[in-house]
Amino acid sequence: MKEINELKFYDKMANWDFSQIKYKEQNKTNWDFYKKIKENTNEKSLCLDLGTGGGENVLKHYPNVGMIIATDFSKEMIKTAKENYKNYPNKNIKFTLMNNLEMTFPKEIFDLISARHTIINAKQIYECLVDGGTLVIRGVDQKDCWEIKELFGRGQAYKDEMPISEKDYLDLKEAGFTKIEKVQILHNEYYKTEDDLMALLLKTPILDDYSEIKNEDFVHKPIIEEEKFNEYVTKYKIEKGILLKRVYYGIIAKK
């Protein structure tokens, strides 16, 4: 089950900051998570950000709204977020500990709920949104980093029969959302050195062999086989850097 696996992994992460990893980005799809949030909010909107992690993204990129409640199920993440908040004293935001699957807010309170690379409970989100409220999701899809997953023969959601993007879509439809837009987001990353790419793979669950759908035990595997890694680097190293093809999905759902 996606929920169990992600809880086990992210609860161990005290910092989700990749600033030390050197890479360049190339967006191939015109769909920006924070622009979509801005398009669906105003300066009075009450927003909920699920799975906020260490707060780096919500603090830097969230638009100017009335108030942001930012939650995460990891105590270490929330601790980090509160430390990062000290650098943004004018941001109207509150960080609080909460499991996305057991939301503790009143019904029909939020104008917008955002969820970036995290688990969701579609029914509870629907209940917490005001009529006409918006849900904005950006997630990691099954085909993300597919070339390196195929080379290693394993990876996050590698063997799943249904992409997590489709599961989220169906869950939202069942919860009661009537207007749902889902898009595939293609994004290239070019890592400056082998060490930069290795740092990413060691820190993230990209090559962890677990299901996003099934209820399976999950242990983060911080070991990358050198021979296969070198084979990938040889094949995908170009002038811009070492190419990693990212595949995400975006969803906008209206209540």
Predicted stretch roles:
Residues 101-112:
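A short acidic, Gly/Pro-enriched loop at the edge of an enzyme's catalytic core
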Residues 46-102:
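Class I SAM-dependent methyltransferase SAM/SAH-binding core
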Residues 110-124, 139-141:
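A short SAM/SAH-binding and catalytic strip from SAM-dependent methyltransferases
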Residues 181-255:
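Conserved Class I S-adenosyl-L-methionine
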Residues 122-136:
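A short glycine-rich, Lys/Arg-flanked "PGG" loop and its adjoining helix->strand segment in the class I
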Residues 1-41:
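Conserved class I S-adenosyl-L-methionine
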Residues 141-159:
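Short, glycine-/aromatic-enriched active-site segment of Class I SAM-dependent methyltransferases
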Residues 161-176:
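Short alpha-helix
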